[in-house]
């Protein structure tokens, strides 16, 4: 039953369930009430200095008494970094058109203001360097001049970023798993959280766009409370195992998004424990063809494959194609219902459907884990080692696995079975004490699929695999397992190898009195532990009085696991905390162990919670639950917590930790400084073949026996920072991968180093990024760590301990240790010799004696020789007199533009011999000496990349025939006849061009590509260009292909597949797309050279026989330009981005937004003609995670130069090739582009879709069932299905509808290949018609027309992505889309209409096809978009109707120099 608004109003007035539509009444802000709000992410913003809180009024924000609570003081972070006010039902925003005071509350989907905010050191900052401030009259304003700090009221000084919004990915519904949009408007009310409103089944739901009635995109919300009540209606229960499963087959998420969605419901991604469970999953999907995410992953850098829910991994069914090589990026597992060996590995960033799994009872596992850490005094016979009720013996005799098994059995024992992390700790200690590196354990498998079992028949309840394990050997009947000493991890081995082995048998348990600990204390290893349950401040807890002798210090993961188990016995409340001895009370920026009355201890291990340590200067407490045992920084005096106490076992002294500092010099060209225990090496683009992803970079370092760089202490970060400054120009903004990451899903979202050193500093203190997928960090030379997507490609830095000799990979090309500095390399020869000898040596090494051309280079050289020199030596440089008393010159012939002579040392009096220059290692000053004197020296070699470009012989401009277009030194002819009968195939087109004295066009640059594309505006016919697939590296005119723009949909050299015709090899030729229905505008793809129906572009060189004129000089660029129904204004002035905004407004325009390829191409030609970069209206407020247009335009179109170009600043410009770059907003550029934004129109189609058994998505006046594209039916069955739903199979009537359909189908990724269409072949006039009798407009059908020659009985029409109409046997099973007219009732007539409460029928993905797989990657590899498609997640699946093109007569347009048509 639907609730009426009158019944809802009293609920809206409750503070515990704010809805934001009522004033609310004053209430005391009790700690309990605050905690209740904060659990929902709702907080009160308090001025740290003024102690008053922000209240939102109707038109102004003010500071008020925090204790006078009302809803207008309550705030919440929402989608897209918005700040939502509960009472005002609006979002905090900046209106740049009101610069005198832009700050206020606005509609949360307003396109006229900026609604993004971020935290920076307790400041609330927005775009254009605005931040939230307090004015003299206690009003809250935005300013760019001052800074004000804000905290969360009642949090003990915590900032408001502790409550950042976290995406909720929807379940079922019609949104394909897209995240909820908060707030969203439903029934004329803004909802900042999931709601049950409008539903009779009481399930939580949300909209995935800002207005539900407009878009009707929705889904169910992950409900954390469902973990407490078992399986609800969106879960399916296996009655035999009492396990619940949720099949999200219509969603398309990355692995981490799917993992998060399952976790939010108290579950986890699917784990498969045995063949029975796998068969259950397979049978559930037996009628489908689908590949789904499961919880299998290898994201822990220190371990192997694991299940994300912690389930032991002993059952495996890998596909033979799985690659276990370390450089492979596929680290997440999938399950395929359509192959016997169903498990595959995929790139975790791929988007797929997924299955969640939830145990109804996890208590049994928790009891076993807790009991494993309990101390039991145990007695064993001589020669055996006691540990917790069992006895163990390491046999130091190498045997095969089977021999070891029989040997243990002969001794009344068994090969060791390992049941917990506690037992791993014991085994690691045992092997270490016995100096054994590896041993057999009792795990093996002789089954297919592989199922590892213990030799003593005990259950496998724990696994601990090594990196890249378990690796399954093909064609091997039995697999055996060993454990290594360093971490106790397991490896799959050939059973015939020989190793040591450990036997295990039951021991005799002694009484508890013999534990060695006092009553109330628990023992682990050589220490006793106790919990003081009284809440105290850190100062009280650490005094040694309440917690004698000291708070706990934690040295490794085993001790942490024991303590987590210990605190589980006393935790009753969700927010219980326990003080530990870690602190930074002196605010050094580095956390250390400081137990009371004891020496400070170095930190060997950390176990932080997400976003920790948040700041320096705090004290550390361990969390009791959610998640248990994780560490968080708290205020040392204000925060109260229980205490964890630790003392040595009686009569046992605490071992003193001795930190050893190796003094071994760094090997080869690794670098360090005195006092550091490690050496570093920078791998930059000048020295390696390519930039790499984070995992590739880590594997690269591992090849040397190293890891990506970590910072064990502040001194290491300082050294790396100086190292980068010493090599690169600080203006380059280079970014280098380091080992900082949060990839491990079992690590609670906390950051860690890949070499496992502890995290002791707040590296991400100044920026908060929320729960996004940027799980790896880069380092910049200004001491900045920046989170990025791990799949981005960057340079990197490796680190290795001083006393470890680097390995030399087989692919490594050894070179003498040259040092890099700003595009040159230097070799320091420390031995002494004459100047002429070194000139020969340097020449032999293809270099020259050192030249110094700047103060920076001088400083670099001086710092190096000062460190290398003994007794203040001087070093030869490349200065020499050609004859005595001549001027000194550089020997390589470069001019002397910088000098640093010591006074009087350049040339002594009465000099009679030839002299050469040197540099002093003490002062850095230059002097001269006789060239025969022996000194050390330095060689310098230039890089291959030159500092200036070679200048080609200038070409001469000429003339073009009438009807041809001028472009640079070419004439171009665009030939697209209006009569379709005049359209050409490739051979005819080339013949036409040849008769005109030219050839089909060879596109040689981005600008030429843009010029042709902009001239195709208004056309829907694709055009031939001069490439064939038998030589796609050479143009028809013989020039090499130096520029290309291939469609991501096309596969070079592979002909299209048609189910009705087994094609022979046919020649393919290149087309340029001007129809965006199936290929992006301007992209190239191959087609049968003999196909007619296309236009073409010819080229020939301009005629230079007469007087050549450069029309760029004759016709200057006008300031106002018209193109494609848009008006542009060019601003020529030296200005910042902010000044560009204001200047455009002064002219009645806006800074330009660019939303499609046509206008991008037009502006590319304009900018290239102007010759300098211009500001455009794109900007970011969150360090490049999201970008907005300053005029409020919403578009997913981007044109970045490369992936790095979006990370260099907050404001964006376009260069002279049209490519986009970000830079600092205060930078000065020579111009900006303004435009008059197109008017936005309200929807002309207010109809709604009726509720039936399947979900519908509305477009214009029709509704579509996209959930059925994953169901496999014959044409007839699909037709009947739609008919029962009161609809028909899909028909497509225009380009806008076609574009909408393809946009929606992209959301299914590789899951959709073909769908049935409601079309038939009319034999009377040999045309294809829709079943309603209307003809198909074949000119609108993408890249290939249907061939009527192949229409035969029993063949039906399908839409194949991305090729267009295809023929298939009607009995084949394919997906389909039902279509019906929308309900004529409007949203106003249905105020209580909610989303359909029917649950989407389970559907699954069709067979993966190569063409569609490439289609799936299209937004990731789309030219200049790179990895930004996922970064622009706020624009996922947008639909923007195609422009209603009308032919534009470009010959009468602007840009005379290039666009004019000759009158000759």
From Swiss-Prot:
Is Transmembrane found in the keyword set? yes
The disulfide bridges present are 53-66, 91-108, 180-206, 194-221, 262-356, 332-348, 408-503, 480-495, 619-636, 701-798, 776-790, 842-939, 916-931, 1069-1089, 1211-1225, 1282-1378, 1356-1370
Domain called Fibronectin type-II: residue spans? 175-223
Q: What is the membrane topology here? A: Single-pass type I membrane protein
Instruction: Give the Cytoplasmic compartment stretches of this protein.
Output: 1420-1464
Provide the C-type lectin domain boundaries: 240-357, 387-504, 524-645, 675-799, 821-940, 967-1098, 1123-1234, 1259-1379
- Record keywords, A-Z: Cell membrane, Disulfide bond, Endocytosis, Glycoprotein, Lectin, Membrane, Receptor, Repeat, Secreted, Signal, Transmembrane, Transmembrane helix
Per UniProt, subcellular location reads as:
Cell membrane
The superkingdom of the source organism is Eukaryota
The record ties this protein, via SUPFAM superfamilies, to: C-type lectin-like, Ricin B-like lectins
GO CC terms in record: extracellular region; plasma membrane
What residues bear carbohydrate chains?
A: 95, 456
Main localization of the protein?
membrane
Q: Which PANTHER family match?
A: MANNOSE, PHOSPHOLIPASE, LECTIN RECEPTOR RELATED (PTHR22803)
What job does the chain carry out?
Answer: Receptor for secretory phospholipase A2 (sPLA2). Also able to bind to snake PA2-like toxins. Although its precise function remains unclear, binding of sPLA2 to its receptor participates in both positive and negative regulation of sPLA2 functions as well as clearance of sPLA2. Binding of sPLA2-IB/PLA2G1B induces various effects depending on the cell type, such as activation of the mitogen-activated protein kinase (MAPK) cascade to induce cell proliferation, the production of lipid mediators, selective release of arachidonic acid in bone marrow-derived mast cells.
According to UniProt, the name of this protein is Secretory phospholipase A2 receptor
User: What is the originating organism of this protein?
Assistant: Pongo abelii
Q: What is the lineage of its organism?
A: Eukaryota, Metazoa, Chordata, Craniata, Vertebrata
The gene name reads PLA2R1
């Amino acid at each position: 039953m639907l609730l009426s608004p009158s019944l809802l109003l009293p609920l809206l007035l409750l503070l515990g369930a704010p809805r934001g539509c009522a004033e609310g009444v004053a209430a005391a802000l009790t700690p309990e009430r605050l905690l209740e709000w904060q659990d929902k992410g709702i907080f009160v913003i308090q001025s740290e200095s003024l102690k008053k809180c922000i209240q939102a009024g109707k038109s102004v924000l003010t500071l008020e008494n925090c204790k006078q609570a009302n809803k207008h003081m309550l705030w919440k972070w929402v989608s897209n970094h918005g700040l939502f006010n509960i009472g005002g039902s609006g979002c905090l925003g900046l209106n740049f058109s009101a610069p005198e005071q832009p700050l206020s509350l606005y509609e949360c989907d307003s396109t006229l203001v900026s609604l993004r905010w971020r935290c920076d050191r307790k400041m609330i900052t927005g775009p254009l360097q605005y931040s939230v401030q307090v004015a003299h009259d206690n009003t809250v304003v935005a300013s760019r001049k001052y800074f004000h700090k804000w905290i969360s009221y009642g949090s003990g000084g915590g900032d408001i970023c502790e409550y950042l919004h976290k995406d909720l990915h929807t379940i079922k519904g019609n949104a394909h798993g897209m995240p909820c949009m908060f707030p969203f408007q439903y029934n004329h009310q803004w909802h900042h959280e999931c709601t049950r409103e409008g539903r009779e089944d009481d399930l939580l739901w949300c909209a995935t766009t800002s207005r539900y009635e407009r878009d009707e995109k929705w889904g169910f919300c992950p409900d954390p409370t469902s973990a407490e009540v078992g399986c609800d209606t969106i879960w399916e229960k296996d009655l035999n195992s009492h396990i619940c499963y949720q099949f999200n087959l219509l969603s398309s998420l990355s692995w981490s998004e799917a993992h998060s969605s399952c976790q939010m419901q108290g579950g986890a991604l699917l784990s498969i424990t045995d063949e029975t469970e796998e068969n259950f999953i397979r049978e559930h999907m037996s009628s489908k063809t689908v590949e789904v995410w499961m919880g299998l992953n290898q994201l822990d850098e220190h371990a192997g494959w694991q299940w994300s829910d912690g389930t032991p991994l002993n059952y495996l069914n890998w596909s033979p194609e799985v690659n276990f090589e370390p450089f492979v990026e596929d680290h997440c597992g999938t399950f395929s219902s359509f192959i016997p060996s169903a498990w595959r590995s995929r790139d975790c960033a791929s988007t797929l459907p997924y299955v969640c799994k939830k145990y109804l009872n996890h208590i049994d596992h928790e009891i076993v884990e807790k009991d494993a850490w309990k101390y039991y005094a145990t007695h064993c016979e001589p020669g055996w080692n006691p540990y917790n009720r069992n006895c163990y013996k390491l046999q130091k005799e190498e045997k095969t696995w089977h021999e070891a098994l029989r040997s243990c059995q002969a001794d009344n024992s068994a090969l060791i079975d390992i049941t917990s992390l506690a037992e791993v700790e014991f085994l690691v200690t045992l092997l270490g004490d016995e100096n054994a590196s590896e041993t057999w354990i009792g795990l093996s498998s002789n089954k297919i699929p592989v199922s590892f079992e213990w030799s003593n028949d005990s259950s496998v309840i724990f696994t601990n695999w090594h990196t890249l394990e378990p690796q399954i050997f093909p064609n091997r009947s039995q697999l055996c397992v060993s454990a290594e000493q360093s971490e106790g991890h397991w490896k799959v081995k050939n059973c015939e190898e020989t190793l040591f082995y450990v036997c295990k048998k039951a021991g005799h348990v002694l009484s508890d009195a013999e534990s060695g600990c006092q009553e109330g204390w628990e023992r682990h290893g050589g220490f006793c532990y106790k919990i003081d349950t009284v809440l105290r401040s850190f100062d009280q807890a650490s005094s040694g009085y309440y917690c004698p002798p000291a708070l706990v210090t934690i040295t490794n993961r085993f001790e942490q696991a024991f303590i987590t188990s210990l605190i589980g016995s006393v935790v009753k409340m969700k927010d219980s905390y326990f003080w530990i001895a870690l602190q930074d009370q002196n605010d050094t920026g580095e956390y250390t162990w400081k137990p009371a009355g004891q020496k400070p201890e170095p930190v060997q291990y950390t176990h932080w919670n997400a976003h920790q340590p948040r700041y320096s200067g705090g004290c550390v407490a361990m969390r009791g639950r959610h998640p248990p045992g994780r560490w968080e920084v708290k205020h040392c005096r204000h925060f109260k917590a229980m205490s964890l106490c630790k003392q040595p076992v009686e009569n046992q002294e605490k071992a003193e930790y001795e930190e050893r500092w190796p003094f071994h010099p760094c090997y080869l060209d690794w670098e360090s400084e005195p006092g550091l225990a490690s050496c570093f090496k920078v791998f930059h683009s000048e020295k390696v073949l390519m930039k790499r992803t984070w995992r590739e970079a880590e594997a690269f370092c591992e090849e040397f026996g190293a890891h990506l760089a970590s910072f064990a202490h502040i001194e290491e970060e300082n050294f790396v920072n100086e190292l980068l400054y010493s090599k690169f120009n600080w203006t380059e903004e280079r970014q280098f991968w380091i080992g900082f990451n949060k990839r491990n899903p079992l690590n609670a979202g906390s950051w860690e180093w890949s070499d496992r050193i502890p995290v002791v500093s707040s590296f991400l203190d100044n920026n908060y990024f929320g729960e996004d997928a940027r799980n790896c960090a880069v380092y910049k030379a200004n001491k900045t760590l920046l989170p990025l997507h791990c799949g981005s490609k960057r340079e990197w830095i490796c680190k290795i301990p001083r006393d470890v000799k680097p390995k030399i990979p087989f692919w490594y090309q050894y070179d003498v240790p040259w040092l890099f500095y700003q595009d040159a390399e230097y070799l320091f020869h420390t031995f002494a010799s004459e100047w002429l000898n070194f000139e020969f040596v340097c020449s032999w090494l293809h270099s020259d004696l050192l030249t110094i051309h700047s103060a920076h280079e001088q400083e670099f050289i001086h710092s190096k020789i000062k460190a290398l020199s003994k007794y203040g030596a001087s070093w030869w440089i490349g200065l020499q007199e050609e004859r005595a008393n001549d001027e000194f010159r550089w020997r390589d012939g470069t001019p002397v533009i910088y000098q640093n002579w010591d006074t009087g040392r350049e040339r002594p009096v009465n000099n009679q011999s030839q002299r050469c220059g040197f540099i002093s290692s003490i002062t850095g000053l230059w002097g001269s000496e006789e060239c025969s004197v022996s000194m050390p020296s330095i060689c310098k070699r230039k890089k291959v990349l030159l500092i200036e470009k070679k200048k080609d012989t200038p070409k001469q401009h000429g003339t073009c025939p009438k009807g041809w277009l001028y472009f640079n030194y070419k004439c171009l002819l665009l030939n697209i006849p209006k009569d379709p009968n005049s359209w050409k195939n490739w051979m005819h087109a080339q013949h036409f061009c040849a008769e005109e004295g030219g050839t089909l066009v060879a596109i040689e640059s981005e600008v030429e590509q843009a010029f042709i594309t902009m001239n195709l505006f208004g056309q829907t016919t694709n055009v031939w260009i001069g490439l064939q697939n038998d030589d796609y590296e050479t143009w028809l005119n013989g020039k090499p292909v130096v520029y290309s723009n291939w469609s991501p949909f096309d596969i070079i050299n592979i002909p299209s597949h048609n189910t009705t015709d087994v094609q022979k090899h046919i020649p393919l030729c290149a087309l340029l797309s001007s129809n965006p229905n199936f290929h992006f505008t301007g992209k190239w793809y191959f087609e049968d050279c003999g196909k007619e129906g296309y236009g073409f572009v010819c080229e020939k060189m301009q005629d230079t026989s007469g007087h050549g004129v450069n029309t760029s000089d004759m016709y200057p660029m006008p300031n106002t330009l018209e193109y494609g129904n848009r008006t542009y204004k060019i601003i020529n002035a030296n200005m910042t981005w902010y000044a560009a905004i204001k200047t455009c407004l002064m002219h009645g325009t806006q800074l330009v937004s660019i939303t499609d390829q046509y206008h991008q191409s037009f502006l590319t030609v304009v900018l290239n003609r102007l010759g300098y970069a211009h500001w455009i209206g794109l900007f970011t407020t969150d360090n490049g995670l999201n970008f907005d247009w300053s005029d409020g335009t919403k578009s997913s179109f981007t044109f970045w130069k490369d992936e790095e170009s979006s990370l260099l600043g907050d404001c964006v410009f376009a260069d002279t090739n049209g490519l986009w770059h970000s830079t600092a907003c205060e930078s000065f550029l020579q111009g900006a582009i303004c435009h008059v934004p197109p008017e936005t129109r309200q929807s002309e189609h207010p109809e709604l879709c009726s509720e039936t058994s399947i979900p519908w998505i509305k477009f214009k006046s029709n509704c579509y069932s996209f959930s059925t594209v994953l169901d496999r039916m014959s044409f007839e069955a699909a037709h009947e299905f739609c008919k029962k739903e009161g609809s028909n199979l899909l028909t497509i009537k225009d380009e806008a509808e076609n574009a909408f359909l393809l946009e929606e189908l992209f959301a299914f990724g590789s899951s959709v290949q073909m769908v049935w269409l409601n079309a038939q072949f009319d034999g009377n006039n040999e045309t294809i018609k829709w079943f309603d009798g209307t003809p198909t407009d074949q000119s609108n059908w993408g890249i290939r027309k249907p061939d009527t020659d192949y229409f035969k009985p029993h063949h039906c029409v399908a839409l194949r992505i991305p090729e267009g109409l295809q023929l298939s046997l009607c009995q084949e099973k394919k997906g389909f889309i039902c279509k019906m007219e929308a309900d004529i009732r409007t949203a106003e007539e249905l105020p209580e209409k909610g989303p359909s409460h029917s649950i989407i029928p389970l559907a699954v993905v069709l067979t993966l096809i190569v063409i569609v797989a490439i289609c799936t990657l299209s937004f990731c590899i789309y030219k200049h978009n790179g990895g930004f498609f996922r970064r622009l997640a706020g624009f996922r699946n947008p639909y923007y109707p195609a422009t209603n093109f009308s032919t534009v007569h470009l010959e009468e347009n602007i840009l005379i120099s290039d666009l004019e048509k000759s009158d000759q």
